[in-house]
């Protein structure tokens, strides 16, 4: 099997590491057998070479092997809303807000997230600020999903083997393969996904990685203004996997009867500001904050196969917010997590 040094040499020569070799290397990383220096060198080498679909798929396969799973038997309408982060947009937590709307409209949300890496606040940070207990055991996450329609999986609890790469990733401070693996490794095995990415090239790559990994219905999105969400300020590039086939296209807010907004109205400087945006959106306060949530929740409902199109998903999302169902879903989720954790 390939040695660490031979793999590094391969990246220096801009040659691909084959599937079985990548499986071997990633297992060495996840089991603590590879040195921090070599982890860093290999991660940077892959980044400079540009990671291939096969390399990413192999690495994600191993990360899934080492993950602590959430026991969910029924995966119908089970969807994850997450992003790679790293878009430096400093917006409020759009996908986290959208999950309450999507769940209220009939999706079952298995959200995989953590604390802030590049944003003002990560999904874990803002959920805690909303009063939720995020540190649940896998069986408790499954119970929360069954009771509230949402299960939040705090990434460090489900990927303990990532501790070997964590310090290296933090010290490097640049994007590597580890930044794009998280959204590919949902511990509940959600086969449906709305994933935002930080670069347009990743749209075609990530959707094809998920195709190889056996996902059911996926939308990988990149707002052409630089957001890792579906944007309200112009076009969004989408890679869609459905029925085993991949297609790429662009959408515009006007396609769904939504106005175009500047992104400045979505920016926040703190976790508390993000919480304020979430509450305003769920209270049906008109404006860009609510509308970007409706758009992304609509896409999540389409990815979850609850809605037959993004447009119909937006209509269902609008109804869930206007009726108060989305706000009630947030309250129910928070109460359920606190009861399960014993914090109520």
UniProtKB/Swiss-Prot annotation:
Record carries keyword Glycosyltransferase: yes
GO biological process: L-tryptophan biosynthetic process
Binding-site list for Mg(2+) 1: 95, 229
Domain of life: Bacteria
Residues holding anthranilate 1: 83
GO cellular component: cytosol
GO MF terms held by the record: anthranilate phosphoribosyltransferase activity; magnesium ion binding
Annotated keywords: Amino-acid biosynthesis, Aromatic amino acid biosynthesis, Glycosyltransferase, Magnesium, Metal-binding, Transferase, Tryptophan biosynthesis
Residues annotated to bind 5-phospho-alpha-D-ribose 1-diphosphate: 83, 86-87, 91, 93-96, 111-119, 123
EC number: 2.4.2.18
Catalytic reactions on record: N-(5-phospho-beta-D-ribosyl)anthranilate + diphosphate = 5-phospho-alpha-D-ribose 1-diphosphate + anthranilate
Positions with a binding annotation for Mg(2+) 2: 228-229
Similarity section: Belongs to the anthranilate phosphoribosyltransferase family.
Subunit (UniProt): Homodimer.
NCBIfam families on file: trpD (TIGR01245)
Role according to the record: Catalyzes the transfer of the phosphoribosyl group of 5-phosphorylribose-1-pyrophosphate (PRPP) to anthranilate to yield N-(5'-phosphoribosyl)-anthranilate (PRA).
Protein name: Anthranilate phosphoribosyltransferase
Organism of origin: Methylibium petroleiphilum (strain ATCC BAA-1232 / LMG 22953 / PM1)
